[in-house]
């Protein structure tokens, strides 16, 4: 996914750099109650990121923290965008061209932080629809999306698996008869893969899980 996002940026002629001293945003530590670790990571990140003007990340959790949470404690001098917003802008500006070559049925799982916390539901759809004419919505979508099961640091909580949210969402995706499910969050990407694999009936082809950057990069013209 990261390589495909880089492919998109380079296709558009975007000048970019990668942080040499990148740290986690601290979101998992914060959600798990480790406020000291969160504070340390936040302080380091703000010092580093205030040296630049524009920041792009592929993780909605990171956007929420870098853009919203850090402002409660620091003066923020940079602007943060989710990678789907960048891709959508590049499309609108005509800086990338997409050949809608995917004839598969494609649906989209809205990440909670992107759709509800950041109020972003259009950008990923603009990008997906440009590449996949056979796009359709899941029953619970947009701001009414069903959590993938990794939110609130639950990615690190292990249990028997019975009744877990990611299995409920995976069942919905499988029942939709889609060929591919696309998302815009690394946590959602992982949970989709964990849920869909075990629940796919024997003899049925497993639904592919992709990031928005993947489906766009695959169809660049």
Predicted regions mapped to residue ranges:
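Iron-sulfur cluster-binding electron-transfer modules in prokaryotic oxidoreductases
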Residues: 1-221
